[in-house]
Amino acid sequence: MPGIEQPVSRKNETLVKLSSLADEFVFNDEVQLNLQDVLQECVDTYQNYQDEVKKIKNMDHTESEKVSELCKSAYIYYKIVHNFITKVIPHLPEFEVATGPKASKLQAELIKIYYSLFSRLESDKKISYIKNIIIKHMDTQENNHSVESHEQVKLSNKKLPVNRDAIEIDKDSILQDIRYINGKRSGSGISCSELLSLMKMKEDSLLLIDVRPKLEYDAHHIKTKNIICIEPISFKESYSDQQIEKTSMIPSPKHEIQLFQRRSEFQYIILYTDLEEKSNFYFQQLKSLLEILLQRSFLRPIDDRKTKVLFLSDSLQNWIKNGGEIDKSQEVSKIRNRSISGSGPLLNSLSERKTIGAFPDINRNSTKQMPISPLPSLPGSERTVATPPNGSSTLGRINSPVTHYPKAPLINDSEFHLNINNNHSPPTHLPSKDNNPLASSMPIGSDHKPFMSPQNSLPLAPKPPTLESKNYNFISDRSNIIDQKQNRSRSLEPQLPPIPSTLIRKNSPEKTLSCNQMMDTSFTVGLENMGNSCYINCIIQCIFATTELIKIFLNGTYAKHINKQSKLGSKGVLSHNFAKLLKDMYEENSSKKIGKKHGAVKTLQFKMACASVNSLFKDASQQDCLEFCQFLLDGLHEDLNQCGANPPLKELSPEAEKMRENLSLRVASSIEWERYLTTDFSIIVDLFQGQYASQLRCKVCNRTSTTYQAFSVLSVPVPSGKSCGLLDCFIEFTKTENLEVDEQWFCPSCKKKQPSTKKLTITRLPRNLIIHLKRFDNMMNKNNIFVRYPQILDLTPFWANDSDGKLPPGITDEIPARGQVPPFNYRLYGAACHFGTLYGGHYTSYVDKGPEKGWIYFDDTVYRPVRFQNEFISPSAYVLFYHRITS
C-alpha cells in the first residue's frame, strides 16, 4: 500500500544499494553547505541524469548489460538530486529566509530554481522505466549465475593443502627486513619478501594503494587489512593530494576514502600495480602518484620521518610465488562497480562526467552570466562554502582529472616508422626544413593553415619544396589499407586557419574586436580578490600580457576552434569564460580612457567556471598559483585541441625503441613532437608548449632509454645557498644524476638492474616560456633564496643540438624544424611572486605593459608603475614568464 514501507525483496536489493551510494555522496560531506552551492550541484547532476536518459533512449536494447549500467548510473544521479531537493535544502537555515518575505533578490532567484527542479523530479516519468530495467536485469543475472554459484560453493568447501614451511614466521629475518626498509628513502622500491615481512609485523601501520583499474582490483588484489584502489586513469601527474582525495576518490567506497584521509597516520604507505601491463601506463601513473604523495601533499603533508612512501618493485605474480595472499573477486562489485576506466561503469564516474558536461553550452544570447539552460540561471554571486565531491578533468596531462591514457612513446609497434598521422592517411610528400623560427606547430602531412597571431611580425615562410618519397609507408604499417578517399581529401583533419580580419560570426553573443581594430593590449585593470583568489589574479595578469594569445580571444577567433568532441575538454566552458574575463578587463580599461568611473573587475564567474571543471578551485581556500597556471593552460588546450578526439598513440616495440636510441636527441625528439601533434594540436601548444628528454643510461654497457615529455610550465630546482642565478637553476635541472641503488634501472641489455644515471635535456623551447622555481621541498619547506633572473635570458646552451645528420629509414629529407632554430633568446614579461608559506601567504605580480607604460606592479585591485628600475627582479619570484625574441 502507498505510504507503508514494504520489506525489501531481492528484486529491489540492487535499487537499495544504488540508493545507498547516492546517500553516501550527499550525506557524507562534513562541509557546511549554502543554498547556492547545493543548487549548483543539483543542476549539474540533473544535467548528467538527462544525458544518461538520452543515451538509454538511443542504445540498442539487445545490449542488456550496457543498458543496465546506464540505467544504474542514471538512477544514482536521480537519487542524488532527489536527496538534495527533499532532504537537504529544506533543512538549510538559508532556505527558511529565502522562502520568506525578507528574501533578497538573489535568494528569490535561487528559490525559483529550487521549485523548478522540484517540479521536474515530481513529473519525471522516465525513472519508473529505469527502475524496471535494473530489476529485470538482476533477475536475468540471478538465473544465469545460479548453477555457477552452486559449483563455487562446492569448490569453496574443499580444503587445500597448507604449506606450513611457507607461513612459518622467522622473526629474526623479518626484523632484519624491517630495519632495512626503515633505512630506505621514501620513493624507493621494496621486494615481495620485504612487504611480506612488513605485513607480518606491522600490518596495522601499513596502507597499501593498488594503482590499477577497479575491475582488476575487484577481481584480485593483495590481501591485507588497510588497502585502497586509486585508478591510474583518475589522476594526472600535476595533481595535488587534495585533488586525489576530492576528485579521484569520488567513486571509491566510504571506508577507502577514510583510509586515504588518514594516510599521514600510517608508518608505511606502499604503492603497487601490474608491472606486466603492456603499455607501461600503470607503472608510469604509479610513479606520478608516488611523486604527488611525496612532493604535493599540501592538504595532509606526509612527514618522511614518520611515514615511508614506497612501492612494490615486484609483480603480483611474484607476490603469489613468494607466498603472498590474494583477495579474490567480490560479488558486490557486479552491483556497484564504480570504476572510471573503460566504458559503461556504474557512475562512469561522477568526476569524469562532471568534467565533460557539468555546464551545458553557454547561452549564446547573453553575455551577462552563464545560464544553466533550460533551468533558470544561477546568479553570479560569490560562492564561499561547500566542497561537495566534484569531478575534475585534470584535463590532459594538466599535465592532463581525469586523464586519458598517456601518449604512448612514439613510433609503431612493428618497425621504426614515423607514425606521424596516427589514424589519418599518409601524406604524399614531406616538407623540407622550416627556417622560420616561429613556424606554427602543424602535424606533418596535413594541410593545416597556421594559427598565427595577427600581430606576428614575421610573415609565414613560403611553402617549401616538396620531396617525393618512395618509401613513405614509414608513416604507419597500416597505410596500405587506409581509405584512399582520405588521400584525396584533408577535409576531415583538424584545421587551424589564420585569424580572419573580420568578426567570426554574426550571432556571437560576445563582443568581439576585429583584427583591423586598434587593440590596446597594454590595458591595466585590477582584479578583485574573491576570497583568497590572489593565486588566480597574479597568473591572469601575467597570462594576459601574452599578446598573441589575448588577440585571439579578444577578436573571438578562438570560438571557431573549440572542439566539443575533445575527450578532456570542458566543451568551451573554460574558454568562453576566459574570453569573457579578458573582455571585461579590456572594456573596463576602455571606459577608464573616456572618463567613466572605473573599478576592479570581478573574477567570480570565471572562478565558478574553473570550479565546474576542477573542484580544487571551488571553495575560498588558498591554492598554489603554479597549479592554477597549469590547469588554465591545459584546460584551454583541451578545449581548443583539434585532435582531442583522436585515439592515443601506440607504444614502441623493444626493437623500435632500440633503433630510436641510435638517433640523435635532435632527430628523435622532432619525430616524437610530430607524433605528439596528432593527438595534441592547439594554439596553446603553438604558443606555450615545449619538450624535454629524460634519458636513463646503464653505466656498465652504456645502453640508454629515453622518454620525451611535453610541458607548458618548466619546473627547475633552486639550488641551496644564499643566492643564485636563473642559469644555475637550469644547470641543476640538466645535470647528470647518479641513481641510488634502490632506484637503479633494469637494463634490457644486461638483463638486470645496473648502476645507472639519469639526465634531463631540453629538446624543444616554446615561443613563450613559463618557468616555475621549485622553492618547496618534500617536507613543504620553502627555499627563500634570491634567484637572480635576467631581463634577457639566453637558453641556447641548454637546447639539444647534437644532430649528426642521421635520419631514420625511409626519410630522405630533414624533419621540419618547427621554429627550433637557435639562438634561443628570451625577454622577461611577467613575474608572479609569493610571500609566506605554502599554507598561507599572498600572491602579487609584475607585468611588462610595453614601452609606453613599462613595468606595472599588480596586487589584486591595486596597481602602479614600478618605483625603481629593476623592482620587478624580486626575491619572492615564483613563476616567470619569458617571450622569445628573434632579432
From Swiss-Prot:
Short name of one Pfam family: UCH
Top-rank lineage group of the source organism: Eukaryota
Region: Disordered, residue numbers: 358-465, 484-505
Polar residues bias (residue ranges): 387-402
Major subcellular location class: cytoplasm
Subcellular location: Cytoplasm; Late endosome membrane
Gene Ontology cellular component terms for the protein in this record: late endosome membrane; proteasome complex
Positions in coiled-coil regions: none
Membrane topology: Peripheral membrane protein
Domain USP: 525-885
Keyword match Ribosomal protein: no
Gene3D superfamilies: Cysteine proteinases, Rhodanese-like domain
Active site feature: 534 (nucleophile), 842 (proton acceptor)
Protein keywords: Cytoplasm, Endosome, Hydrolase, Membrane, Protease, Thiol protease, Ubl conjugation pathway
An example molecular function term from Gene Ontology annotations: cysteine-type deubiquitinase activity
Presence of keyword Nucleus: no
InterPro entries in the record: Papain-like_cys_pep_sf (IPR038765), Peptidase_C19_UCH (IPR001394), Rhodanese-like_dom (IPR001763), Rhodanese-like_dom_sf (IPR036873), Ub_carboxyl-term_hydrolase (IPR050185), USP_CS (IPR018200), USP_dom (IPR028889)
Record comment: activity regulation: RFU1 is an inhibitor of deubiquitination activity.
Record field: catalytic activity: Thiol-dependent hydrolysis of ester, thioester, amide, peptide and isopeptide bonds formed by the C-terminal Gly of ubiquitin (a 76-residue protein attached to proteins as an intracellular targeting signal)
GO biological process: ATP export; endocytosis; free ubiquitin chain depolymerization; intralumenal vesicle formation; protein deubiquitination; regulation of DNA replication; ubiquitin-dependent protein catabolic process via the multivesicular body sorting pathway
UniProt-listed Enzyme Commission number(s): 3.4.19.12
Family annotation (PANTHER family): UBIQUITIN CARBOXYL-TERMINAL HYDROLASE, UBIQUITIN CARBOXYL-TERMINAL HYDROLASE 4-RELATED
Sequence similarity: Belongs to the peptidase C19 family.
Function: Ubiquitin thioesterase that acts at the late endosome/prevacuolar compartment to recover ubiquitin from ubiquitinated membrane proteins en route to the vacuole. Also removes ubiquitin from soluble proteins targeted to proteasomes. Is essential to maintain a normal level of free ubiquitin. Required for promoting coordination of DNA replication and avoids DNA overreplication.
Protein name as it appears in the record: Ubiquitin carboxyl-terminal hydrolase 4
Organism from which the protein derives: Candida glabrata (strain ATCC 2001 / BCRC 20586 / JCM 3761 / NBRC 0622 / NRRL Y-65 / CBS 138)
